[in-house]
Amino acid sequence: MSDKTVPVFSMAELRDGSRQDEFREWARRGVFYLTGYGATERDHRVATDTAMDFFAQGTAEEKQAVTTKVPTMRRGYSALEAESTAQVTNTGTYTDYSMSYSMGIGGNLFPSKEFESVWTDYFDSLYRAAQETARLVLTAAGTYDGEDLDTLLDCDPVLRLRYFPEVPEHRAAEYEPRRMAPHYDLSIITFIHQTPCANGFVSLQAEVDGEMVSLPHVEDAVVVLCGAIAPLVTQGAVPAPNHHVVSPDASMLKGSDRTSSVFFLRPSTDFTFSVPDARKYGLDVSLDMEKATFGDWIGTNYVTMHAVTS
């Protein structure tokens, strides 16, 4: 693992171009931290607490009522170990050691009106911030050749709160090195706001210059990771870094729980791309066609993710 440090930019710096050369360098690596983007620590805490209360207090019946029956959509509650990123990426069959709640623009499954109000406001603030950030990232590289940016950024985003419980002994690093498999996101960009593990363990890592780099919690900041759409619209200049969530070893299980609030700025489902170009840029697209839509791609992944083997 590398000891490289990923820089922190403020939205004000990105807007005024005061660190433009450095920002362009890190946009071309596909990962950086961002502060001053609109949402506050209180916004994150209220939304996280709302979901965590439901995880802890919701009955089995209440959780079942907000568990989607549509395998191609991320909506509502997903139980602990109900998904496997490893299956999607063909890196194993182990499950994601987390539970989650997800929402989007429509088709949502809210546990209560209060939950809906808190999460809708949170979603809207992150959507605005992610749109502005994506515009700055995609134009920084100087190679943008996608459709009109306003059209691309009229998106079908997903907001997901993941809770990674304290790691049990059988999922310690000695037995299973990861809580979540290496993957890149199917998004334009992704915001990740994380809470730190109480014991100081850093779980999130991303690939930078061919090495995995730790991404610890930074106060008032989100991690920005560029997703698979970025290389498709920048002639490969902006990558989609692989990232994963690693497991602590047996000596650091206590206090290893954490949360991760993830906003995927996904294009509309009718966004069309060249499958050969995607493969040229290192993306694993198994669809047997020359041109595909984002809806074709994402739907296949979600079905595979939920086909958890026992």
UniProtKB/Swiss-Prot annotation:
It is an enzyme of class 1 (oxidoreductase). Keywords: Antibiotic biosynthesis, Iron, Oxidoreductase, Vitamin C. InterPro entries: IPNS-like_FE2OG_OXY (IPR044861), IPNS-like_sf (IPR027443), Iron_ascorbate_oxido_reductase (IPR050231), Oxoglu/Fe-dep_dioxygenase_dom (IPR005123). Pathway: Antibiotic biosynthesis; cephalosporin C biosynthesis. It catalyses: deacetoxycephalosporin C + 2-oxoglutarate + O2 = deacetylcephalosporin C + succinate + CO2. PANTHER family: 2-OXOGLUTARATE (2OG) AND FE(II)-DEPENDENT OXYGENASE SUPERFAMILY PROTEIN-RELATED. Hydroxylation of desacetoxicephalosporin C in 3'position to form deacetylcephalosporin C. This is Deacetoxycephalosporin C hydroxylase.
